[in-house]
Amino acid sequence: MAKGDFKLFDVVLDETIGRSTPDVEHERAVAIFDLIEENSFEPVGHPGGPYRLSLSLVNARLVFTITTQDGEAVATHILSLTPLRRIIKDYFMICESYYEAIRSSTPSQIEAIDMGRRGIHNDGSQTLKDRLKDKINLDFDSARRLFTLVCVLYWRG
C-alpha cells in the first residue's frame, strides 16, 4: 500500500439488483471506466489506498463499502437516499426527454435539454459530495461519476 495513494482501483456495483436498459448500462460502464482512470478518493482518517469501492442499496440506503487493494476493510458508510431521491427522479425524467430528443428534435432543442440534464447532474453530484464530506473527500469530477453510479443503482433497484 502506497501511503497517500488516495485513488480507486476498482468499483463494484451490487449485481443482485440485475441489469437495466442498454442506455443505462452504457452510462454505468463509462462512469466506472472514467472513475477508475481519474479520481480523487480519500476516506477520512485512512493513510492511503488504492481502494476498491463496492456500492449497493440496502433498505433504500446507499452503502459504500471500502477496502484496500489487499482486501483490508477500511470503512462502510451508509447514506439515506432521501436527499438525493428528488434529484435522481428529475435526472431520469430529463434523460428520457434527452433520448427522445436525439431521435426527433433539432440540435438546438437537444442542446437545451442537455444543458438542463447536466445542471441536474451537477446538483446531484454536489449533494452527494456534501453528504460524504465528513467520510470521504472527493473532487467534483469523482463525485459526478459516483452520482451516475448511484443513479444506475437506484434505477435498477
Swiss-Prot record:
InterPro entries: UCP032146. Disulfide bonds: none annotated. Belongs to the UPF0262 family. This is UPF0262 protein Avi_0642. It comes from Allorhizobium ampelinum (strain ATCC BAA-846 / DSM 112012 / S4).
